[in-house]
């Protein structure tokens, strides 16, 4: 008696979303971000708020913050990620984390800019180089928090919120082909296939492709920050961080589509740490104003705006590839 492998019925391509469905879906994103912002601006402020006479949210700059504050803030981020994943379901595995971090940007906005740290560095006996080194170390702390949040968020999504709707919505025809098993390596199709083939990166092993993708994404983000981050105003700083890592991740994804998303996300805090160390000897051109662009943002700015930008850039590249496939790799 022989057994045959069970087969599943092919999934037809879904009909395009109606205008009302798009509005409702994006309204859920807005609600998730607002709830996350309320959580971090109230409870999170009690954990990470700067001293009354200063400003700027930092895990290491102020002596009243320690590992306990970082641990509690991580737990709060995990809770916000779970709530946001529930609100935006069904969606991609990292949309809950993206909404939670965008809400966490409210904590950064409430905390103020890096101006107070610049003033502190200009006091007698102080050195901005030491402050920049501390901020670079803080970026590594945020990188650890990111790894914990990304891993927990992915496990939570796979356990409770796993779905294929986001793949079908990203590319109806190729998404259906991917889920039905008729095409392999669908994320490597279209523009991503053309770019990776032309650059010769298509068949790179992952242990080579991942570091190259991180270096390329970091270099592009550094260039975009140089162009976009022209002031220390918090809104402009957050927008510059989001746009820089969105563009860099999208472009590098097309060259390295097989590199997993954690590598692109880790590029954000590592790029910020490298930027702090690179500009640690920059002098203030005017009192309270830094001439080096990357030092106009705090680590929390890179974390709460840069990582959502990288997430949206990654999935924009995924969507672009699925929508523009005229050529596919051999099975």
Language model feature labels by segment:
Residues 42, 104-112, 219-223, 268-280:
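Aromatic-anchored segments of alpha-helical transmembrane domains
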Residues 82-179, 197-199:
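Membrane-interface helix-loop-helix junctions at boundaries between adjacent transmembrane segments
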Residues 219, 239-250, 266-269:
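Hydrophobic alpha-helical segments embedded in the membrane of multi-pass proteins
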């Amino acid at each position: 008696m022989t057994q045959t492998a069970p087969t599943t019925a092919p999934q037809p391509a879904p009909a395009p979303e109606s205008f009302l469905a798009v509005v409702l879906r994006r309204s859920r994103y807005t609600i998730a971000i607002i709830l996350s912002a309320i959580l971090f601006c109230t409870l999170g402020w009690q954990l990470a708020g700067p001293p009354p006479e200063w400003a700027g949210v930092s895990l290491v700059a102020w002596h009243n913050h320690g590992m306990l504050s970082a641990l509690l803030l991580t737990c709060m981020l995990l809770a916000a990620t779970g709530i946001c994943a529930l609100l935006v379901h069904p969606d991609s595995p990292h949309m809950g984390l993206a909404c939670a971090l965008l809400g966490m940007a409210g904590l950064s906005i409430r905390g103020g800019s890096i101006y107070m740290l610049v003033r502190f560095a200009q006091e007698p006996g102080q050195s901005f180089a030491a402050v920049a080194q501390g901020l670079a170390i803080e970026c590594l702390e945020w990188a650890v928090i990111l790894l914990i949040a990304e891993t927990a968020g992915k496990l939570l999504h796979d356990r409770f919120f796993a779905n294929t709707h986001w793949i079908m919505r990203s590319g109806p025809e190729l998404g259906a082909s991917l889920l039905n098993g008729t095409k392999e390596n669908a994320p490597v199709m279209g523009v991503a296939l053309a770019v990776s083939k032309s650059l010769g990166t298509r068949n790179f092993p992952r242990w080579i492709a991942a570091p190259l993708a991180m270096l390329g994404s970091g270099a592009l983000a550094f260039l975009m920050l140089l162009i976009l981050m022209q002031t220390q105003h918090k809104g402009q700083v957050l927008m510059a961080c989001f746009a820089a890592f969105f563009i860099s991740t999208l472009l590098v994804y097309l060259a390295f589509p097989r590199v997993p998303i954690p590598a692109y996300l880790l590029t954000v805090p590592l790029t910020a740490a490298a930027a702090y160390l690179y500009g640690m000897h920059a002098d203030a051109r005017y009192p309270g104003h830094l001439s080096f662009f990357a030092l106009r943002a705090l680590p929390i700015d890179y974390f709460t705006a840069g990582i959502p930008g990288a997430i949206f850039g990654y999935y924009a590249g995924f969507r672009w590839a699925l929508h523009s496939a005229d050529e596919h790799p051999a099975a």
